[in-house]
Amino acid sequence: MSFEQQLKKGVLEMLVLELLAKKSMYGYEMIQTLKAASEDFFVLKEGTLYPILYRLEDNDFAKSSWSEPKDGQAPKKYYEITKKGRERLLFQKEHWTLFEKKVDELLRGNGK
């Protein structure tokens, strides 16, 4: 796995929770939203996203429900963040901010 892939993998759960904190979404919608918002930097495949979503559900950070079929379209599975998921997201964002700060300090030679 490349350095870039390792970095991306480390933040995907946080990014998915951030999307769900804004609104309930189905999988393909998350993939497209993340791709557009990151200007094609985060391009996920379903095989990457769905294990994250399943893990979020298993840990009660997200829950899912099926939409009603519309105009002959198949129902979609929507995911939404839970209260526990919002707490997890806040925790991750706080640690991400500290992590980013410390890495930046070290790279600039300002570390102790």
Would you name each region that the model predicts?
Residues E4-Q6, D60, G111-K112:
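Short, contiguous hydrophobic alpha-helices characteristic of membrane insertion segments
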Residues I81-G85:
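Accessory beta->alpha helical hairpin/"wing" motif in late/C-terminal subdomains of nucleic-acid enzymes
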Residues E57-P75, E80:
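Beta-hairpin "wing" of winged helix-turn-helix
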Residues R86-K112:
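Amphipathic alpha-helical dimerization/coiled-coil segments
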Residues Q5-T48:
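N-terminal helix-turn-helix DNA-binding core of bacterial DNA-binding proteins
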Residues S2-Q5, W66-E68:
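Short beta-strand/turn micro-motifs at beta-sheet edges
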Residues L49-L56:
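Basic amphipathic alpha-helical segments that dock to polyanions
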